[in-house]
Amino acid sequence: MLKIKLEKTTFENAKAECSLVFIINKDFSHAWVKNKELLETFKYEGEGVFLDQENKILYAGVKEDDVHLLRESACLAVRTLKKLAFKSVKVGVYTCGAHSKDNALLENLKALFLGLKLGLYEYDTFKSNKKESVLKEAIVALELHKPCEKTCANSLEKSAKEALKYAEIMTESLNIVKDLVNTPPMIGTPVYMAEVAQKVAKENHLEIHVHDEKFLEEKKMNAFLAVNKASLSVNPPRLIHLVYKPKKAKKKIALVGKGLTYDCGGLSLKPADYMVTMKADKGGGSAVIGLLNALAKLGVEAEVHGIIGATENMIGPAAYKPDDILISKEGKSIEVRNTDAEGRLVLADCLSYAQDLNPDVIVDFATLTGACVVGLGEFTSAIMGHNEELKNLFETSGLESGELLAKLPFNRHLKKLIESKIADVCNISSSRYGGAITAGLFLNEFIRDEFKDKWLHIDIAGPAYVEKEWDVNSFGASGAGVRACTAFVEELLKKA
């Protein structure tokens, strides 16, 4: 992980092997920009990166005056620098966008530091020739690129220290999620997932309860159990329950995650191409583990429960079948018409378990539907639920954190598509359209009336795992949901 060192000095006086200078909105007029003739000769117009080898300056373009683009550009700069021979880089403090906001300086520093730190991530566990980055340190000179309004209340140094703490915690939490999601299924089993959760619990002094199939049987979590039937003798299920309890808690929050450590589709077998990357179907459960790490280290004033349903969905003589009827923990019967709609079965029982805790808010995370990716693209998560205020708060705070989110509306016409003639509900829609919403409506069937306005469903199927670099995310897992939900919890507590 890149070490960031804060120094009370000017940018010019800071010492490092290389300088990083951002070109914001194609403005080359600042004194930190050197050798403008060279930039003109090579027609560098402030987009992407450009290395001035003579002066050892890396220029990184920020296309617009936008804090999210600053974060992305910082990440791109570090990705470039890690391929070079510099051990250290220095950078000043930049303020992009929303200069009139009281927290503008803090948010810019968070973005800068997080972008710098995330730029070094690469999942290379199984590479025989690992190329370790030479870059080890970023020196941040506590000098403003330009004055920022309304920052008198908080000194630059104080804001920088707070931002650095956030960036370190968030980077660690995101890397926990990314490493877990990227772990191949031969290793990343339900038991392995529980072991990762136990490490997080031990480090943060959290309560943890890891339950096996016998517990699931006792609690009548038959929908969850059905999904695991083909894997039971080899990779049994785990219900993981993490608990963070601060001395003062303004709210009780339950975070629920789908932890499908591998999903071949079951007897409704996926085509070969669709099976590849299904190690990422544990993205929701992994995000919950990362969130418990982040929220505990940030010391939020909320009692937080993290509930992960970890299992495989495989084929075999004991596999559950289309035409099966399952009785869920909530007592509702489910007609199975497609075994590849399995994540919602696991979540149904886990949401029932979460409601037994009587939380003030329930948020579930799942790589639930390909339909969500078709509808919103691979970079955006969907928000569903009944409470407009809660949905808006998650969307607004999530967007400010740098994640992309959009609300999808429930409606009575789509609800009819999951009706069953022989059970209380069907696990798959009778139509190919609106699949992300019908999956959310299926989960809604297992939310009790008193929790309808307390529940949010977040479908992270798109951004949880993308096979290319984008924004501050490396190839593979992104840790989708962690930044957004952390910001959501912080905003929720401000209103408590």
UniProtKB/Swiss-Prot annotation:
Its EC number is 3.4.11.1, 3.4.11.10. It is an enzyme of class 3 (hydrolase). Keywords: Aminopeptidase, Cytoplasm, Hydrolase, Manganese, Metal-binding, Protease. GO terms for biological process: proteolysis. The active site is at residues 270, 344. Mn(2+) 2 binds at residues 258, 263, 281, 342. GO terms for cellular component: cytoplasm. Gene3D superfamilies: Leucine Aminopeptidase, subunit E, domain 1, Zn peptidases. SUPFAM superfamilies: Macro domain-like, Zn-dependent exopeptidases. Binds 2 manganese ions per subunit. Belongs to the peptidase M17 family. This is Cytosol aminopeptidase. It comes from Helicobacter pylori (strain ATCC 700392 / 26695). The lineage of its organism: Bacteria, Pseudomonadati, Campylobacterota, Epsilonproteobacteria, Campylobacterales.
